[in-house]
UniProtKB/Swiss-Prot annotation:
Protein name in the entry: Aminopeptidase A
Presence of the UniProt keyword Glycosyltransferase in the record: no
Database matches in InterPro entries: Aminopeptidase_N-like_N, Aminopeptidase_N-like_N_sf, ERAP1-like_C_dom, M1_APN-typ, Peptidase_M1, Peptidase_M1_aminopeptidases, Peptidase_M1_dom, Peptidase_M4/M1_CTD_sf
Family note: Belongs to the peptidase M1 family.
C-alpha cells in the first residue's frame, strides 16, 4: 500500500469534494501503477559505463598546515537557550561589522574546506556581554577569540549555536562597552551536497574529472560559507585570501593583490580590500578555467571565464558585456566602482545567475553561446541575463535595499533596465517591446490571484525571504517602473535614478528613498501614486463606457473571489496615469483613486467618426481595459480589415486582455474568440507569442475532451497555417523572424497540423540518421519528432546525445525531447534517472520534472513522482530552496479535476511544512480550483462558438 492509499479512506470520509472520488481511488491507483510501476519493481535508469566525465572521484589529498584546524573537535554546539535577544530574527542595530579578514582553504577532491575569519566590530551605544552572528551547517573548530582594538584579550565564557535563527552566540566573561572589537573564529565546512554557500561541482575534460568550487550566497547563504552578520544592511569591507593547490586559480570580488607559494603544492592568493558590501554579494571561485577578455571604454578589464574546451562560447557574452557595461556607466552617470569585472559559468548552478560585485556567477545556459549550436532564443537569453546582472552592479551593489521587504529595488530595477541594456547591443530585437511578453503580461496573471502579495511585503524568516524572489518582485517591479518612466518622462526618470544612486552611494535604501528622488526631479507626487502599486497586491481593470467614462475595480481571475480580501490600506483603488490614444491624438489623463465616479477622457472634437479610443496605449500601464461588448466587436472588425491600425504591443495587449477578461467572467468568450479571427493576417512575433499563450489555456483545459479539442485544433490550426506555411521549416539570420518561426511552428504542431508534424518527424528521422539540424529548429524537432515518431531506439539515441553533449543549452533541448516521448516505460526510466547525479545535474532536476509534466502522458507521472519522492527532494534541496518551493505550482498549472485537487490537498496535509513554497502552494490550490470552475462555467460557451466557426457562413 503506497503513501496515498494509506490515507485515502480517511479523506474520502471527509466528503471534501465529490462522492465519486472514493469510488475511483482503486481505479486511479491502477492507472498510477501503470505510470510509475507502483507495486512493481521500477525500471532502473541504467546509466552507461562511467567515462570519467562526471562521477570519478580521485583520492583525497593533504591539506597545508596554514589553516588546518587542530584535531576534529567542534565548538559552539547547538543549545536551546532562549534567555536572550538572540531569539529575534533580526540582528541588533547596535552591533556593526566594519571589516572581515577571511582566509579559506578548500580541499577540492575531499570536498571540504577550512577557514578563519577575523571580524572588526563596532559596538554602538549599548553595553552587552553577548555577541551573535549567523552560521549554518559550517562548524566552529576552535573557541572563538575576542580582543579589544588595542589587542587586549577578552575571555570567552561560552559559545553556542542557536539553530532557530541560525546564530552562533558568544558570551564574554565581562561587559563589552561601546567601542571597537576583533572577533576571530576558525571553522570547517563541506563543499558537497548543496548548490548554495561555498560548494563544488565537477565537469569533464579529455576524459578526466575536473573540480570547480564557487559560491552562491543570496539571500541567506553567506552564513553557510563563513560566520558573518548576514543581513543586507550590515555592509562591511573584506580582505579575502584563498589557499589552493598550484594547478588551480582563485578569483574573488576584487583583483589579486599578490600570490604566495607556500610549498611545492599550495599557493595562497590574497585579494585587494573591497569596497563596503553586503554579505550576499561576497564571492569567490577556485577553478582551472580560461577567460575571454574585453576592455571597457574607461579601461576596466571585463573577463568571461569558462571551461577551457568551451572558451569559444564566451565570445558573445564578452561582446555584450562591453557594450552594455559602457551603456550603463553613461546612463547612470556613475562609474562602475571596482577595478575589474569577472563573469564565470558554473557547470551546476541553482539559480540563473548571481550579481556578486566584481564576480558574477552564471548557469552555463545563461552565459555561453555557440552560433553553431545555440538558437536565437538562447542568444537573447544570454544577452538579457548578462544585462540584468550588469544593472545590479549599480542597483543592488552600489545601493542595496535596506531589508528584503524591498527586494524589488534590486530585482525590479534589473528586470526593467535589462531590456534597455540589450537594446543598446541589439537594436533590431524589439527589446523595448518584448518587456510586454516577457514580464508585464505574464505577471498580470500571477497578480490576479488572491494568493498574490504586494511588491513590498514583510518577511521574517529565510523561507519568507526566499519566497519573494518571484514574478511580483521581478516582473511587476519592472512593469510599474515602465509605467512610472512613461508618466514622469524618460528624462526625469533617468535623472531620478542618477540622484538615487548618488544620494545613497555605498549605502542602503528603502522604497521611499527612490520615490523621494523621483519627486525631486519631476515635481510630481510620485510616492502618493506609486504607493498604491507597491503596498497593495493586484491591479485594476478599467471599464470604458460609450461616453468615454472610465471606472476602476480590482481585477481578479476568480469571479467568485472577494475583491476586498485580504484587506488593503488603499481599499484596492489605484492612482493611475491613464495613457490613451484616439486618431493621431495621444495623452495621459490622471485618475485619482478618490474619484469614485470615475473619470471622463476628453477627446478632441475633430476626430473622424470611425476613430477608436485606445485606452492604455502601448500597454504601458499595469492594468487591464474592458470596453462595452459592441466596442469589442467593432475592434474585431477593425483588426480583420487592417490590424496595422494598431501597433504590435497594442495588438498583443488586446488579445491578452480579452482572454483574461473572459476567464474572469467580465467578457463573453464569444467576443474574445471573435478577436482572434484577424490572426490569419498577423505576421509579427510579439502579437503571435501572446496570442498563443492566451488561447493555449483553453486548449489545456479541454485537451482531454475528445469532442471539443479537435474543434479547437481545427480552428486555431487554420489561423496559424498561413504564417507557418510562409515561414517554412528552414531558417535565416533574422533574429525576430527566428523567434516568430519557432512560435508559430510549435503552435501548428500542437494543433496537429499534418504538414508541421510531418516535417518534424522527417527532420527527426534524418537527425537520428546523423544529419545535423538547424539550431533554431532543434527544440521543435526534438520535441515533436520524439512525440510523434519516437520509439525506444530513438529515445536511447537521444539520451546518448544528451549524455555526450557539452553545451548546456543543447543538453537542455535534449532533455525536453526525452520528456516528450509518448511511452510510459521510457518516461518512467527518465524519472528514475533524476536520482542519478552522474546523468542529471542538481540544477536540472526541476527542469526535467516540468518538461515531463508538459507531456500529456507524463503530467500525472511527474505529479505522482514528486509526491512519492518528496522526502528525498527535501533532503536533497531543503525546504528553503526556491525552485523546490515553486515545483508544485509549476507542474500543476493545468490541473482541472476534483481528484487532482483532492490529491493536492491530501499531499499538503501530509507535508504541512512548505518552507519557501508556502505562497506557491496557495497559488497551486487557487489555480486548480479556478480551472475546475472554468470547465463548469465556460466549456460550453467555447464549444458553441467553435461549432459556429465551422459553419459555412461563419464570418
Amino acid at each position: 500500500m503506497d503513501i496515498e492509499d494509506k490515507s485515502s479512506k480517511m479523506h474520502c470520509m471527509k466528503g471534501k469534494h465529490v462522492a465519486i472520488i472514493c469510488g475511483v481511488v482503486i481505479a486511479v491507483g491502477l492507472i498510477l501503477g501503470l505510470g510509475l510501476g507502483l507495486g512493481l519493481k521500477p525500471e532502473a535508469c541504467n546509466p552507461p559505463e562511467d567515462n570519467g566525465l562526471l562521477s570519478t572521484k580521485p583520492p583525497t589529498t593533504s591539506t597545508p598546515n596554514v589553516t588546518n584546524p587542530s584535531g576534529s573537535s567542534v565548538f559552539c554546539s547547538a543549545k536551546n537557550d532562549e534567555n536572550g535577544a538572540w531569539t529575534n530574527f533580526r540582528l541588533p542595530n547596535y552591533v556593526q561589522p566594519v571589516h572581515y579578514d577571511l582566509d579559506l582553504t578548500p580541499e577540492m577532491e575531499a570536498e571540504v574546506y577550512t577557514g578563519m575569519v577575523n571580524i572588526s566590530i563596532r559596538l554602538e551605544e549599548q553595553t552587552t556581554r553577548h555577541l551573535w552572528l549567523h552560521l549554518r551547517e559550517t562548524k566552529i573548530t576552535e573557541m572563538p577569540q575576542l580582543r579589544t582594538s588595542s589587542g587586549q584579550v577578552i575571555e570567552i565564557k561560552r559559545c553556542f549555536g542557536y539553530e532557530p535563527q541560525e546564530y552562533v552566540v558568544i558570551e564574554a566573561e565581562e561587559d563589552l562597552r561601546p567601542g571597537n572589537y576583533f572577533l576571530s573564529m576558525k571553522f570547517k565546512g563541506y563543499l558537497n551536497g548543496s548548490l548554495v554557500g561555498f560548494y563544488s561541482t565537477t565537469y569533464g575534460e579529455n576524459g578526466k574529472t575536473k573540480y570547480i568550487a564557487a559560491t552562491d550566497h543570496e539571500p541567506t547563504d553567506a552564513r553557510k560559507s563563513f560566520p558573518c552578520f548576514d543581513e543586507p544592511n550590515k555592509k562591511a569591507t573584506y580582505t579575502i585570501s584563498i589557499t589552493h593547490e598550484h594547478d588551480y586559480e582563485a578569483i574573488s570580488n576584487m583583483p589579486v593583490e599578490k600570490t604566495i607559494s607556500l610549498d611545492n603544492k599550495w599557493t595562497k592568493t590574497i585579494f585587494k580590500k573591497s569596497v563596503p558590501m553586503s554579505t550576499y554579494l561576497v564571492a569567490w571561485a577556485v577553478h582551472q578555467f580560461k577567460y575571454e577578455e574585453r576592455i571597457s571604454s574607461r579601461g576596466i578589464p571585463l573577463r568571461v571565464y569558462a571551461q577551457p574546451q568551451q572558451i569559444n562560447t564566451t565570445i558573445y557574452a564578452a561582446n555584450v558585456t562591453k557594450v552594455v557595461f559602457d551603456y550603463f556607466e553613461n546612463y547612470f552617470n556613475m562609474n562602475y566602482s571596482l577595478p575589474k569585472l569577472d563573469k564565470i559559468a558554473i557547470p551546476d548552478f541553482g539559480t540563473g545567475a548571481m550579481e556578486n560585485w566584481g564576480l558574477i556567477t552564471y548557469r552555463e545556459t545563461n552565459l555561453l553561446y555557440d552560433s553553431q549550436e545555440s538558437a536565437a532564443s538562447n542568444k537573447q537569453r544570454v544577452a538579457a541575463v548578462v544585462a540584468h546582472e550588469l544593472v545590479h552592479q549599480w542597483f543592488g551593489n552600489i545601493v542595496t535595499m535596506d531589508w528584503w521587504d524591498d527586494l524589488w529595488l534590486n530585482e525590479g530595477f534589473a528586470s526593467f533596465f535589462e531590456f534597455m541594456g540589450v537594446n543598446a547591443k541589439e537594436e533590431k530585437w524589439q527589446m523595448l517591446d518584448q518587456i510586454l511578453i516577457d514580464d508585464l503580461l505574464p505577471v498580470l496573471k500571477d497578480d490576479s490571484l488572491v494568493s498574490s502579495h504586494p511588491i513590498t511585503v514583510n518577511v521574517s524568516s529565510p523561507d519568507e525571504i526566499t519566497s519573494v524572489f518571484d514574478g511580483i518582485s521581478y516582473s511587476k517591479g519592472a512593469s510599474i517602473l515602465r509605467m512610472l518612466e512613461d508618466w514622469i518622462s524618460p528624462d526625469h526618470f533617468r535623472a531620478g535614478c542618477q540622484k538615487y544612486l548618488t544620494d545613497h552611494y555605498f549605502k542602503n535604501a528603502k522604497t521611499d528613498d527612490f520615490w523621494k528622488a523621483m519627486e525631486e526631479v519631476s515635481g510630481k507626487p510620485v510616492r502618493e501614486v506609486m504607493d498604491t502599486w507597491t503596498r497593495q497586491m493586484g491591479y485594476p481593470v478599467l471599464k470604458v463606457d460609450l461616453n468615454s467614462t472610465v471606472t476602476q475595480q480590482r481585477f481578479l481571475l476568480d469571479p467568485k473571489a472577494d475583491p476586498s480580501k485580504p484587506s488593503s490600506q488603499f481599499s484596492y483603488k489605484w492612482n493611475i496615469p491613464v495613457k490613451w490614444k484616439e486618431g493621431n491624438t495621444s495623452s495621459i489623463t490622471f485618475y485619482n483613486k478618490s474619484e469614485l465616479a470615475g473619470i471622463t477622457i476628453m477627446q478632441p472634437s475633430d476626430l473622424p467618426p470611425d476613430s477608436f479610443l485606445k485606452v492604455n496605449k502601448d500597454h504601458v500601464g499595469f492594468y487591464r481595459v474592458n470596453y462595452e461588448p459592441q466596442v469589442w466587436r467593432t475592434l474585431a472588425d477593425i483588426m480583420m480589415k487592417d490590424h496595422q491600425n494598431f501597433n504590435l504591443t497594442d495588438r498583443a495587449g488586446f488579445i491578452d486582455d480579452a482572454f483574461a477578461l473572459a476567464r474572469a467572467g467580465l467578457l463573453k468568450y464569444a467576443d474574445a474568440l471573435n478577436l482572434t479571427r484577424y490572426l490569419q493576417n498577423e505576421t509579427e512575433y510579439i502579437p503571435w507569442q501572446r496570442a498563443v499563450v492566451a488561447v493555449s489555456y483553453i486548449g489545456q483545459m479541454v485537451e482531454d475532451d475528445k469532442a471539443l479539442y479537435p474543434k479547437f485544433q481545427r480552428y486555431f490550426g487554420s489561423l496559424v497555417k498561413p504564417i507557418a506555411s510562409e515561414l517554412k521549416w528552414e531558417n535565416d539570420e533574422d533574429h525576430i523572424k527566428s523567434l516568430l518561426r519557432t512560435t508559430v511552428l510549435e503552435f501548428a504542431c500542437n494543433m496537429d497540423d499534418p504538414e508541421a508534424l510531418g516535417n518534424a518527424s522527417l527532420l527527426f528521422k534524418n537527425w537520428t540518421s546523423g544529419i545535423s539540424l538547424d539550431v533554431n529548429l532543434r527544440l521543435l524537432v526534438y520535441r515533436f519528432g520524439m512525440q510523434n515518431s519516437g520509439d525506444e531506439q530513438a529515445w536511447n539515441y537521444m539520451f546518448e546525445k544528451y549524455r555526450t553533449a557539452t553545451l548546456a543549452q543543447e543538453k537542455e533541448k535534449l532533455l525536453y525531447g526525452l520528456a516528450s516521448v509518448k511511452n510510459i516505460t521510457l518516461l518512467n526510466r527518465f524519472l528514475n534517472c533524476i536520482k542519478n547525479t552522474t546523468l542529471i545535474r542538481s540544477q536540472d532536476v526541476f527542469t526535467v520534472l516540468r518538461y515531463i509534466s508538459f507531456n500529456s502522458y507524463g503530467k500525472t507521472m511527474a505529479w505522482d513522482w514528486v509526491r512519492l519522492n518528496w522526502e528525498y527532494l527535501v533532503k536533497r534541496y531543503t525546504l528553503n530552496d526556491r525552485n523546490l518551493g515553486r515545483l508544485i505550482s509549476r507542474i500543476s498549472g493545468t490541473f482541472n479535476t476534483e481528484l487532482q485537487l483532492w490529491q493536492m490537498e491530501n499531499f499538503f496535509e501530509r507535508y504541512p511544512d512548505a518552507g519557501a513554497g508556502e505562497a506557491s502552494r496557495k497559488q497551486a490550490l487557487e489555480t486548480t480550483k479556478s480551472n475546475i470552475e472554468w470547465l463548469k462555467q465556460y466549456r460550453d460557451d467555447v464549444a458553441t462558438w467553435l461549432e459556429n466557426s465551422e459553419q459555412p457562413n461563419f464570418v
